């Protein structure tokens, strides 16, 4: 994670006071020009007038890179930090820093838990299970240890077997990561029904029970880091204190809720950990002991622990009678603590990661690290959703807008000591917390698409159709939030019609005609069916990232296999640039005035995203032998999502172009019927 830069940054910044909050209105964020409203406030990237497109583009772009890595290099299995060639945009690893094995799994589970129901893309479950399975097979402590069969928190860079980072020692674990990873295993069990993940979660919980101690002001119930064999936390990189007992508590709470494992033990230890948390960190604000690659210090505070606690009690206010006060105070503490600097970037609050008042991580706000600001925005958005305080919605909106500039392969994102960046931040932790935006403020989701945005239960399966969504939840009792591109004619739970209501004080649904936001409460059934008139079947997309082809490759014949014939030499793969953060499509001949492709069997051409990187307006006219033409004009620097409105299949699609030499195309959308 971003903390790898802590030592390097500190060496240059020791004993140099910094302002707690400063304004940094730079013209670029992560190398991308800022986009502002009439008041000079930050708008999202890449489409400033379309929040839904920009936010959705962020999470889907990060997923495309995850899927590409799964299919090719699998670098995140072995490394934490990466750079890419600025010509080919091919990724390569940093060979020197710890691999963040444990909480990377937990963060990716949290991301995919939300992204899968948002898209219905079952490949996400394939990816996540394989990634977690690798840890279960190559990253657990041995039987017979004081901490048996639990995940190590880190590994040496490039190591195929995880046993901890040798810069800190050998054969050690971090108990809070055992809780965090254990919770992820448990939620993955709920997603898939595979009991090996349940058993892995129970092993984590049982180890936490076995090694619990009451704690005091200087000793937490579990150490921040200890040797796995005997549990000792003496000296050096080991340490007795971590404020992060919340993720072990989350694991206990969920096992207790579903009645699995040694529930009586979990209740007892959970109560002890909660009491300690209320008595010490929540009073003293000693928020230390999270990151896997720094040595413990009681003065080095971080924002992860207080914000993740605030998020948990906002989602589960029944756990904490003082949830409102605690969440508000912790948000304020993160934004005002003198331990590390905060920045105002065109009205967006940007937080760095950690610090002690003199030394901090990391560098200037428009270079890294998006995940921490994404977390702050998530908690503020959820606070707005629970309280209705509009000031928190506005703050979350501006901070989330800043986060969107880091999507894809952003050439200006880097550490303070080199061009590489952190996979954990940009492709796991950051996007999982941006997913909270849709749940908290459904109006920020795309208005012209249908998506399940959030549920109080894990969603186990989902299918999107024309004017329909069917899905199942792990729990029979749940409240679900969706945004639709159609109006529901009926909503049923296990075949029983739910009634229209003005609120969710009882089972039923509330539909907002103006925003098309649908909220459903079901108390006794898992299978939900939504049917309506109009709407469109979700299209299939060609992203030009899957399967991967090197930049500059001229398309010859079919790509992907059996879908489109691109002819011979009219089109080529382009690198991420302009307002596209991943690989895309361009003309092989910049002077061409026409180009075409053919479907292997007739398909409905829905449209494509087009960016004009030229200095003149470009005109794109699209037609086919079967269907009339449609045309659009793109100003210099403009990105448009072109939608044809065609309802009939085409055998081929022709593009007539004026000033088309700098056009880029991505996310080609089509339907089978």
PLM-predicted stretches and their roles:
Residues 14-104, 122-168, 203, 207, ...:
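Low-complexity, Ser/Thr/Pro/Gly-enriched N-terminal "stalk/linker" regions
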Residues 65-73, 206-207, 211, 268-298, ...:
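Non-catalytic carbohydrate-binding regions of carbohydrate-active enzymes
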Residues 35-47, 93, 97-117, 170-190, ...:
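Well-ordered alpha-helical segments within folded domains of soluble proteins
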Residues 627-673:
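Terminal, low-complexity interaction segments
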Residues 477, 600-607, 650:
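Extended extracellular/luminal ectodomain segments enriched in beta-structured repeat modules
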Residues 444-538:
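C-terminal beta-sandwich/jelly-roll accessory domains of carbohydrate-active enzymes
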Residues 16-18, 42-60, 115-129, 188-202, ...:
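Structural helix-adjacent loops and short alpha-helical linkers that scaffold large soluble proteins
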Residues 538-600, 623:
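N-terminal targeting leaders for non-cytosolic proteins
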């Amino acid at each position: 994670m971003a903390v790898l830069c802590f030592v390097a940054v500190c060496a240059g910044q020791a004993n140099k006071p910094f302002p707690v909050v400063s304004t940094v209105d730079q013209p670029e964020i992560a190398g991308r020009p800022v986009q502002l409203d009439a008041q000079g406030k930050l708008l999202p990237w890449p489409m400033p007038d379309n929040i839904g497109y920009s936010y959705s583009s962020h999470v889907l772009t990060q997923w495309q890179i995850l899927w590409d890595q799964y299919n090719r290099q699998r670098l995140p299995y072995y490394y934490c930090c990466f750079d890419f060639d600025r010509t080919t945009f091919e990724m390569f690893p940093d060979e020197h820093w710890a691999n963040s094995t444990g909480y990377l799994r937990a963060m990716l589970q949290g991301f995919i838990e939300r992204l899968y129901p948002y898209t219905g893309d079952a490949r996400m479950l394939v990816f996540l299970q394989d990634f977690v399975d690798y840890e279960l097979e190559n990253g657990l402590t041995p039987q017979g240890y004081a901490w048996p069969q639990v995940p190590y928190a880190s590994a040496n860079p490039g190591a195929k077997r995880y046993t901890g980072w040798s810069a800190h020692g050998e054969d050690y674990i971090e108990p809070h990561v055992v809780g965090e990873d254990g919770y992820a295993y448990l939620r993955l069990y709920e997603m898939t029904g595979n009991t090996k993940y349940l058993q892995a979660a129970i092993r984590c919980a049982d180890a936490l029970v076995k090694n619990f101690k009451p704690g005091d002001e200087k000793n937490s119930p579990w150490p921040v880091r200890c040797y796995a064999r005997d549990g000792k936390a003496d000296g050096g990189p080991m340490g007795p204190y971590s404020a992060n007992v919340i993720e072990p508590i989350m694991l206990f709470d969920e096992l207790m809720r579903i009645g699995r494992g040694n529930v009586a033990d979990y209740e007892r230890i959970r109560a002890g950990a909660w009491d300690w948390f209320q008595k010490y960190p929540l009073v003293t604000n000693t928020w230390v002991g999270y990151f896997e690659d720094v040595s413990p210090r009681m003065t080095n505070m971080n924002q992860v622990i207080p914000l993740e606690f605030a998020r948990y009690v906002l989602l589960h206010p029944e756990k904490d009678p003082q949830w409102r006060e605690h969440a508000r105070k912790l948000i304020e503490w993160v934004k005002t603590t003198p331990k590390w600097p905060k920045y105002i970037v065109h009205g967006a609050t940007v937080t760095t990661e950690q610090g002690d008042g003199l030394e901090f991580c990391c560098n200037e706000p428009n270079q890294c690290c998006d995940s921490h600001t994404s977390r702050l925005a998530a908690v503020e958005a959820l606070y707005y959703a629970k309280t209705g305080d509009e000031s928190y919605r506005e703050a979350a909106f501006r901070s989330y807008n800043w986060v969107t500039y880091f999507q894809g392969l952003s050439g200006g994102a880097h550490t303070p000591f080199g061009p590489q960046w952190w996979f954990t931040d940009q492709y796991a932790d950051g996007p999982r917390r941006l997913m909270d935006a849709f749940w908290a403020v459904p109006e920020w989701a795309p208005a012209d698409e249908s998506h399940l945005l959030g549920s109080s239960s894990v969603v186990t399966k989902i299918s999107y159709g024309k004017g329909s969504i069917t899905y199942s939840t792990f729990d029979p009792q749940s409240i679900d939030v969706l945004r639709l591109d159609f109006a529901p004619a009926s909503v049923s739970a296990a075949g029983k019609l739910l009634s229209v209501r003005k609120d969710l004080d009882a089972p039923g649904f509330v539909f907002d005609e103006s925003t098309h936001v649908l909220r459903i409460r079901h108390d006794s059934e898992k299978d939900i069916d939504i049917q309506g008139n109009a709407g469109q079947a979700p299209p299939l997309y060609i992203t030009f990232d899957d399967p991967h082809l090197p930049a500059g490759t001229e398309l010859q014949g079919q790509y992907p296999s059996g879908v489109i014939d691109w002819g011979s030499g009219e089109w080529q793969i382009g690198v991420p640039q302009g307002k596209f953060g991943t690989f895309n499509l361009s003309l092989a001949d910049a002077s061409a005035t026409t180009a075409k492709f053919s479907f292997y069997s007739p398909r409905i051409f829905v449209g494509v995203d087009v960016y004009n990187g030229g200095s003149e307006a470009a005109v794109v006219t699209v037609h086919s032998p079967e269907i009339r033409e449609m045309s659009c004009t793109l100003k210099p620097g403009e990105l448009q999502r072109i939608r044809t409105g065609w309802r009939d299949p085409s055998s081929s699609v022709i593009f007539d172009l004026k000033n088309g030499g700098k056009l880029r195309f991505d996310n080609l959308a089509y339907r089978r019927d």
